[in-house]
Amino acid sequence: MSVPFDPASYDRQLEEKTARLRELLAPFDAPEPQVFDSPREHYRLRAEFRLWREDQKRYYAMFAPGDNKTPILLEGLPIASQRINALMPVLRERWEASPTLNHKLFQVDFLTTLAGDAMITMCYHRPLDDEWLAAAEQLAVELDVSLIGRSKGQKLIIGHDYVTEKLDVAGRTFSYRQPEGAFTQPNGTVNGKMLNWAFDALGERQDDLLELYCGNGNFTLPLATRVRKVLATEISKTSVNAALSNLDDNGVDNVTLVRLSAEELTEALNEVRPFRRLQGIDLKSYDFGSVFVDPPRAGMDPDTCELTRRFERILYISCNPETLAANIAQLYDTHRIERCALFDQFPYTHHMESGVLLVRR
């Protein structure tokens, strides 16, 4: 996939997104959204490239949506972080100089952080052997990165299979492990703005928080400092393990994390059936005043949406404003929008991240 890059059009496209969000939320008497912009370039902390062979050489390539046969060959990527742009030509030089690193290499993924960490994943159509491992270990030292080699049924790790990010929220620095292959917010600067907005919107509370779709604990860590205790759910095993590490690394000890889907937790809270993963957790001991949701693009299913209606405050981060509006429509008879925001996670595309605080009428 390629992303059009036109900094001169940035202000106009951000205003178009803001107008679109206003229009979607207008039926619900929403206040004017706070708008959080993005850096105009070098904002994307991860990038995935297929490699295209031409003139006996391999080039970084991306493809336009719907066309996987016409490569766009790249020397650099202006939307990607400066670290990725610095690594791209050096890595290419190294694989061109090394038959071991070059042979049947077909994809390269980069993951970086604002804190300066970097990881490269090199994917192959062949088994990786000791010769590859020796060359990769030398490469990782030269580039000062963690490096992962992947082939079918094989994953070799040099360094770590995660990067470490550090983000400041209300004067406190939180450290995050971001595992290879797991979801992370791609725009680190805007992610920091989202965390601070959510922290401020939740406010200081004397009750408990339910969090659905907690991922690696991106929002969990700062929000846990605002409440008595948190019950958080996540279905991805990789994300659950990362979240547990992040809670421990940051000394956050008032969070209970369960590996359940939002739909399963709804059944548990409605006492439809017991869940083995909830053994030892007394759901009745929680005094939930707020729920935080950050669902996938499909939004909340109707049952989960009904579950959130029980809460005085619903803090909702959305990557799809259309499904956000549909969920608000379901809740509007009992909750009103007190705050809303637009976060420009994805400049130069139609995608937008938004947030709303819904409060019971």
UniProtKB/Swiss-Prot annotation:
The keyword Repeat does not apply. GO terms for molecular function: rRNA binding; tRNA (uracil(54)-C5)-methyltransferase activity, S-adenosyl methionine-dependent; tRNA binding. GO terms for cellular component: cytosol. GO terms for biological process: tRNA methylation. InterPro entries: MeTrfase_TrmA_AS, MeTrfase_TrmA_CS, SAM-dependent_MTases_sf, TrmA_MeTrfase, U5_MeTrfase_fam. Transmembrane segments: none annotated. The active site is at residues 319, 353. It is an enzyme of class 2 (transferase). The keyword S-adenosyl-L-methionine applies. Keywords: Methyltransferase, S-adenosyl-L-methionine, Transferase, tRNA processing. Pfam families: tRNA_U5-meth_tr. S-adenosyl-L-methionine binds at residues 185, 213, 218, 234, 294. Its EC number is 2.1.1.-, 2.1.1.35. It catalyses: uridine(54) in tRNA + S-adenosyl-L-methionine = 5-methyluridine(54) in tRNA + S-adenosyl-L-homocysteine + H(+); uridine(341) in tmRNA + S-adenosyl-L-methionine = 5-methyluridine(341) in tmRNA + S-adenosyl-L-homocysteine + H(+). Belongs to the class I-like SAM-binding methyltransferase superfamily. RNA M5U methyltransferase family. TrmA subfamily. HAMAP family: RNA_methyltr_TrmA. Dual-specificity methyltransferase that catalyzes the formation of 5-methyluridine at position 54 (m5U54) in all tRNAs, and that of position 341 (m5U341) in tmRNA (transfer-mRNA). PANTHER family: TRNA/TMRNA (URACIL-C(5))-METHYLTRANSFERASE, TRNA_TMRNA (URACIL-C(5))-METHYLTRANSFERASE. This is tRNA/tmRNA (uracil-C(5))-methyltransferase. It comes from Pseudomonas syringae pv. tomato (strain ATCC BAA-871 / DC3000). The lineage of its organism: Bacteria, Pseudomonadati, Pseudomonadota, Gammaproteobacteria, Pseudomonadales. The gene is trmA.
